[in-house]
Amino acid sequence: MAGSKVKEYKLFLDQHPDVSGIDLLIADLNGVVRGKRVVPSALEKVYKNGVYFTTSLFALDINGDTIEETGLGIVQGDGDSTCVPIPKTLSTTPWHKQTMGQLLLTMVDDNNQPVFANPRHVLNQVIDRFKGLQLTPVIAVELEFYLLDARRDRNKRPQPPISKTTGKRENNTQVYAINDLDDYGDFLSGVSAAAQEQGIPADTAVAENAPGQFEVNLKHEADTLSACDNAILLKRLIKGVAQQHGMKATFMAKPYTDLAEIGRASCRERV
């Protein structure tokens, strides 16, 4: 095991002796974060040998059902592949009541090469093509989301949250409304603080076109893989901080039939 890997997890455990568990995370092709929760002492084994996940993880649709046509499911025995740590992604998760940690993983085959369906591998192939042209893509990801009341309405449909400032259910549709940022200042401050603790370069927060609709932007990065890793982690962070504040967050394109849709996770790029 390389010295830098040993240093990373040992330093983390030394700095957080009260950590009670570590979430081992990997994103599927839909950007859904999946994983396992292990005790802190398991980190040594994870950093040394990796941890097994089923390869069919990359054959799941948005509902979690395996698409057998991918050839990654039962047809090949639904076997496992090794997942190894992505450097510099081991961090705490400050939205949990107890001290918890998380680590982002990537999947490799028996020869320690990326599994063909691994989205990080697909992206890396695109990056290599840019390198062949002596170009460097620089990107920043923008994430739009809705904050929701943790409770559904009487018809079991999602509904906007109640503002802690006004005591009323949100109905504002004013884009760039500073008052909306003030009303949800505690939540947005929690997102900013958690992002800073995790080393995620979150930048600007914007109130969007519908009640409880916001956008958080990441800074530009010349490391495209890192930028996308940070986007995946920011989505988890936003959902966690929302829950911490008694709400839910969704990145669903259109949770309400009569309100503005959410733009897809968009990228600003230059080369």
Language model features by range: what are they?
Residues 1-204, 224-233:
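ATP/Mg2+-dependent ligation/transfer catalytic cores
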Residues 3-7, 241, 247-248:
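Catalytic-core signal marking the mid-to-C-terminal active-site face
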Residues 143, 208-216:
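Short, conserved phosphate-binding/catalytic loop or strand-edge motifs used
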Residues 195, 233-246:
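A short, contiguous, amphipathic alpha-helix enriched in charged residues
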Residues 200, 244-251:
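Flexible helix-coil linker/hinge segments at domain or subdomain boundaries
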Residues 253-258:
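Short, solvent-exposed loop/turn elements at beta->coil junctions and helix N-caps
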Residues 261-271:
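Residue-level detector of conserved catalytic or cofactor/ligand-binding positions
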